[in-house]
Amino acid sequence: MLAFTLRFIKNKRYLATLAGALVIIAGLTSQHAWSGNGLPQINGKALAALAKQHPVVVLFRHAERCDRSDNTCLSDSTGITVNGAQDARALGKAFSADIQNYNLYSSNTVRTIQSATWFSAGRSLTVDKKMMDCGSGIYASINTLLKKSQNKNIVIFTHNHCLTYIAKNKRGVKFDPDYLDALVMHAENGKLFLDGEFVPG
């Protein structure tokens, strides 16, 4: 009987400990959403809060490619589709609701230039061919843009292999971005840090 009582007490303590741990985990999950790829999700409000502390860098993959879709092309066959342009415009409106002040850059391809143009709805765009080359040198290129922008927030339209490289290099995760997916970085003391994946909303 005594042995049974001790086992019962131990089980109750174990269950109480387990329940407490689950409550803590649930609390953490409610405060920090995570993507299935292991990257933290950063919505517009979180991005705006981060931008108050440091210059942020948001790197978008371009919109839907015309040459890999049956949808209607916007114009040039090497550019984006009409649907892609409309998606970029809608995304830009949502983004600007939280981040109004930023400088805009893109690589030197038609699809990234069109994506950036529709995203920004007329904002001045600077084309930089270095945003096409994505290896270890990408960070120096981004820091150069930050200096040109006088450490303002910057938005860059680039390519999936760039985002994949950064996610793997900075956080060791596999990131296979869809059209208009984005990564969020911030600059601090001359260094770039990957904060997570941008999720509109």
Swiss-Prot record:
A GO molecular-function descriptor: phosphatase activity
Keyword Phosphoprotein among record annotations: no
Signal peptide start and end residues: 1-35
Superkingdom of origin organism: Bacteria
Main location: periplasm
Keywords assigned: Hydrolase, Periplasm, Signal
Pathway listed: Bacterial outer membrane biogenesis; lipopolysaccharide metabolism
CC annotations in GO: periplasmic space
Transmembrane segments: none
Subcellular location as annotated: Periplasm
GO biological process per UniProt: lipopolysaccharide metabolic process
Enzyme Commission number, as recorded: 3.1.3.-
Function: Catalyzes the dephosphorylation of heptose(II) of the outer membrane lipopolysaccharide core.
Family, per entry: Belongs to the phosphoglycerate mutase family. Ais subfamily.
HAMAP family per UniProt: Ais
Cited NCBIfam families: PRK15416.1
This protein's name: Lipopolysaccharide core heptose(II)-phosphate phosphatase
Organism name: Salmonella schwarzengrund (strain CVM19633)
Native organism taxonomy: Bacteria, Pseudomonadati, Pseudomonadota, Gammaproteobacteria, Enterobacterales
Gene name of this polypeptide: ais
